[in-house]
């Protein structure tokens, strides 16, 4: 691993994860379950290691986006309940039961097929009913035009013998935005959510064990809507405006090292396409990180990185495996020096804004060839979170 670290790596600070978890817990209260969203390999941080730490510190649930992600967690020994947020084909019912996965259901037809298959297999599937309150995606539609039909279908779902109906949830689309229009729409979504729950529970006499609607934006701005559980996604990883406002700490730091330094006269081109020419006699350092590692090519000639002696501008097009930085004003920089691409000092969200995207995308883009190095209680740990 040491030889690999001399190239490019991602440091995952599990102490920062713990800090962020506790900030959320204090914000929503001790009685609310915290669900850790670990889909997309834990937003690029490593789903297994993140899930194991969340299990240690008191998370009540996890969430994934597909059945393979759930299987990876179960194979690693994770025992927490796991909610599959999206679509799973009904022909995967046997795997769902085997993995003890909680499945979201978004229509009567899919719910009935799950129920029928579960009964045939001699089992019962735990499910959460998904409500579409304005996202325009999966879920029973709760707008005025479809409300009554969705209510009837949900009441029918409650009667399916092969399902154990545990929860109900929805997803906010603009809860992270504070414009008047966005605030009003988020309030409308919550009103629709609460109204459907009230109608279902009143007419059926059934009570969902878990009600959840708050994502990162909901947690930060509407903690009074925490219900029984909140879903901690990007905010848990300490990235974005909301995380910064709440005092979260970045969990991932993407780092590399200076491979070599070359001297150039003024007017010399750097990298593909000759998009950058040196403006003066310059010292240009080569970093062994490129877009195949997850450093977006769209960030070429835009970002700064942090050396041990200060910030340096990235220059020229980012290549597949390398990029260049201008260290003319940092004469102390030398080959082997550690460089932060983003992390505690260079915020991922700031880089994301430069290429018109969100920090989720940049973190998820950090590729498999970049080793993740985990730290807990200030020391490096292995995949079982034991000190190395």
Q: Which residues are covered by each model-predicted region?
A:
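A structural signal for short, hydrophobic beta-strand segments that form beta-sheets
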Residues: 84, 258, 314-315
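Active-site loop/helix belt of alpha/beta enzymes
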Residues: 5-6, 40-57, 111-126, 133-257, ...
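Short hydrophobic/aromatic-enriched beta-strand-loop microsegments
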Residues: 79-88, 102-106, 124-130, 230-231
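Conserved, mostly hydrophobic/aromatic
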Residues: 17, 39, 73, 107, ...
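C-terminal accessory subdomain/extension
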Residues: 263-388
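C-terminal helical cap(s) of enzyme catalytic domains, especially alpha/beta-barrels
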Residues: 14, 71-77, 242-251, 359
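A charged N-terminal "starter" segment
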Residues: 1-102, 116, 164, 371, ...
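Flexible, glycine/charged-enriched surface loops at secondary-structure junctions
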Residues: 31, 206-210, 214, 349-356
């Amino acid at each position: 691993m040491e030889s690999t670290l001399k190239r490019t790596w991602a440091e995952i600070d599990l102490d920062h994860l713990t800090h962020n978890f506790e900030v959320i817990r204090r914000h929503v209260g001790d009685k609310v379950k915290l669900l850790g969203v670990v889909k997309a390999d834990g937003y690029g941080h490593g789903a297994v290691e993140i899930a194991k730490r969340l299990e240690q510190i008191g998370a009540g649930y996890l969430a994934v986006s597909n059945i393979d992600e759930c299987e990876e967690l179960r194979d690693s020994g994770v025992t927490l309940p796991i909610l599959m947020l999206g679509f799973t084909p009904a022909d995967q019912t046997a795997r769902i039961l085997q993995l003890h996965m909680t499945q979201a259901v978004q229509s009567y037809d899919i719910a009935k097929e799950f129920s029928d298959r579960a009964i045939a297999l001699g089992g019962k599937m735990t499910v959460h009913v998904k409500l579409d309150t304005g996202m325009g995606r999966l879920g029973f539609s709760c707008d005025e035009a479809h409300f009554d039909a969705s209510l009837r279908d949900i009441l029918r779902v409650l009667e399916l013998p092969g399902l154990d109906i545990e929860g109900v949830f929805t997803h906010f689309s603009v809860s992270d935005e504070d414009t008047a229009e966005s605030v009003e729409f988020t309030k409308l979504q919550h009103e629709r959510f609460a109204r459907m729950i009230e109608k279902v529970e009143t007419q059926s006499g059934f009570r969902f064990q878990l009600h959840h609607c708050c994502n990162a934006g909901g947690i930060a701005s509407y903690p009074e809507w925490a219900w029984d559980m909140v879903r901690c996604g990007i905010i848990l990883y300490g990235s974005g405006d909301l995380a910064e406002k709440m005092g979260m700490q970045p969990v991932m730091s993407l780092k590399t090292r200076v491979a070599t330094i070359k001297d150039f006269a003024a007017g010399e081109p750097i990298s593909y396409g000759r998009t950058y020419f040196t403006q003066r006699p310059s010292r240009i350092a080569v970093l062994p990180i490129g877009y195949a590692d997850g450093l977006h090519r769209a960030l070429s000639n835009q970002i700064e990185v942090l050396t041990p002696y200060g910030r340096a501008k990235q220059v020229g097009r980012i290549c597949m495996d390398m990029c260049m930085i201008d260290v003319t004003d940092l004469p102390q920089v030398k080959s082997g020096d550690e460089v932060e691409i983003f992390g505690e000092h260079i915020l991922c969200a700031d880089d994301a804004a430069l290429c018109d995207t969100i920090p989720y995308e940049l973190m998820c883009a950090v590729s498999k060839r970049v080793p993740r190095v985990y730290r807990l209680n200030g020391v490096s740990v292995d995949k079982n979170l034991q000190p190395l």
